[in-house]
């Protein structure tokens, strides 16, 4: 009840052009404890005082204007459900998607997350039909050029170069620098999963449930995919030799499936 009333009030603001529900609540994989991810697309960001006036009607806790990643209001509805409200300029968002899908820009991990967010959001309000047009425009297979760019860029980050993550992780183990081991291993996995999703022409679902998503949707996975991940996690802080061996196996098996798929990774 509170959720519907909240977004309904935002929809009446003249600067708001579209509203969409993202995350697990946009699909079928959620329960009553799942948070709401609400995306409000605006010509200009509604004033904080206007947002507060709406939010205080429907929320029992509010953090207004957090900007750790995107501008957002993080709140708890009066029914106890957390809600993240993110404010975006639809033209800036469109350019971000265009840069990836049409200009084939690859990042250090998470390349197609925003594209995934667009495609898998449920539109609640779309005053001029712009958000639906954007969804329809980009509801296309992953272009070969984008797939190849993601794989090339992130494979070089995994291995084969002096700054590659596998080399950095080995050096961190040698220093007994476990903070660095943790940091570089996380970066390694960001690039590793970016390659896996690109190789399968899947958009990247984001930081949650990546293993589950890959197992459910990817047609091509490296041999011992889950087993090697488990070995890495089990040994990261207890046995550096076994952790490095797990990384080596992950890289080798990933290279094999890339080669078998006929993808040019050079």
Language model: regions and residue ranges:
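Helical scaffold of the NTase/Pol beta-like nucleotidyltransferase catalytic core
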Residues: 1-20
């Amino acid at each position: 009840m509170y959720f519907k009333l909240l977004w309904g009030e935002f929809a009446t603001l003249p600067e708001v052009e579209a509203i969409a529900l993202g995350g697990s609540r946009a699909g079928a994989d959620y329960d009553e404890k799942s948070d709401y991810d609400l995306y409000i697309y605006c010509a200009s960001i509604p004033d904080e005082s206007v947002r507060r006036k709406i939010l205080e009607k429907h929320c029992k806790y509010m953090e207004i204007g957090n900007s750790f990643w995107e501008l957002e209001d993080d709140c708890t509805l009066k029914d106890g459900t957390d809600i993240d409200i993110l404010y975006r300029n639809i033209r800036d968002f469109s350019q971000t998607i265009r840069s990836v899908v049409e200009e084939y820009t690859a990042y250090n991990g998470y390349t197609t997350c925003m594209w995934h967010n667009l495609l898998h959001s449920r539109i609640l309000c779309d005053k001029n039909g712009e958000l639906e047009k954007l969804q329809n425009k980009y509801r296309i297979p992953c272009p070969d050029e984008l797939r190849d760019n993601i794989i090339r860029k992130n494979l070089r980050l995994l291995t084969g170069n002096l700054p590659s993550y596998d080399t950095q992780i080995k050096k961190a183990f040698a220093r007994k620098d476990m903070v660095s081991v943790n940091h570089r291993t996380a970066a390694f996995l960001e690039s590793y999963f970016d390659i896996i999703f690109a190789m399968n022409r899947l958009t990247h679902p984001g930081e949650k449930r990546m293993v589950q998503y890959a197992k459910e949707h990817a047609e091509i996975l490296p041999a011992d995919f889950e087993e090697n991940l488990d070995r890495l996690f089990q040994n990261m802080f207890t046995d550096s030799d076994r952790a490095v061996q797990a990384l080596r196996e992950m890289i080798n098996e990933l290279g094999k499936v890339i080669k078998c798929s006929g993808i040019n990774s050079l």
